[in-house]
Amino acid sequence: PNAMRSRGRGKLWLASSDPTAKPMIDFKYFEDKDGYDERLMVEGIKIARKVAQQEPFRQHLVREVAPGPACQTDEDISKYARSVAHTVYHPAGTCRMGTPNDASEDGRTVVVDQKDLKVVGMRSLRICDASVLPTLPSVNPMLTILMVGERGAELIRKDAWVNGERRTDW
């Protein structure tokens, strides 16, 4: 199963000082306070089973491969889901965007200023990708991410010129 809209709030950290090394990511699936992730996966598997038993699907089935016929209770389904759940395609939202100095209800602070996409406390560093999105759209996010990138490019172009002169004081 794919955790498309997990309510778990994971974390991202650097694995080494090597800038080419991939970062470490812990998505923290199934760790949300209200149990949403677990309910979503368990119910999703139950619904998939019901759909598979309807014609015309049923006539093509030989047997259920995963999670398998022995996996029937909510507890067993949850255990299975926890062992195989993963993110598909587009992890995002690792750089909280908002108004600087504002903390969210969970105490996390803003990393990127929403008005100019600048990293809080940095003069000329902007983040213009999916990491500033608080949630992903339900469709492929390519156009949304493209829009963020276009806005970032517009802001950079605007800042590159002051009174008709190209800035040199970056």
Positions of PLM-derived features:
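FAD-dependent oxidoreductase catalytic-site/capping-region signature
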Residues: 1-144, 152-170
